[in-house]
Amino acid sequence: MGLSTLEQKLTELISAPVEALGYELVGIEFVRGRTSTLRIYIDSEDGINVDDCADVSHQVSAVMDVEDPITVAYNLEVSSPGLDRPMFTAEHYARFTGEEVSLVLRMAVQNRRKWQGIIKSVEGEMITVAVEGNDEVFALSNIQKANLVPHF
């Protein structure tokens, strides 16, 4: 998935303190708006609880205060990926091959920006998704947002 330059810089700054605490940095989202939000997704083999999120928030806040990469006021949110886990990297798609995914594309493919189907494969920077009986291939750089579809 194509990250903005700011998101790339933030990922570089945030990954070290998150990993030093023993967590996996799943990904980040920076949402601009009236009140901008920096959302950090973390995970671990044992799962994530509120204390884990607080620890990461404290460490990341310290780094952000020193480095100051965001020039506007923002809220910091730290959470687990949840059931509708967002996906950010080719490794995420490969890990969840066979699972259902919902995609929002940056640029339409076949006049559609929203797609949902089963992840079939990942090759380099391309993902193949089975959609309504057809295999559709998407460039990761064209995926604006991707989430697993939970089944209950």
Swiss-Prot record:
Assigned GO CC terms: cytosol
Family annotation (Gene3D superfamilies): Ribosome maturation factor RimP, C-terminal domain, RimP-like superfamily, N-terminal
Location in the cell: Cytoplasm
Gene Ontology BP, a term: ribosomal small subunit assembly
Alphabetized InterPro entries for the sequence: Ribosome_maturation_RimP, RimP_C, RimP_C_sf, RimP_N, RimP_N_sf
Keyword Acetylation among record annotations: no
Organism superkingdom: Bacteria
Keyword line: Cytoplasm, Ribosome biogenesis
Similarity field: Belongs to the RimP family.
Its biological purpose: Required for maturation of 30S ribosomal subunits.
HAMAP family according to UniProt: RimP (MF_01077)
Name of the protein this chain belongs to: Ribosome maturation factor RimP
Species this chain originates from: Erwinia tasmaniensis (strain DSM 17950 / CFBP 7177 / CIP 109463 / NCPPB 4357 / Et1/99)
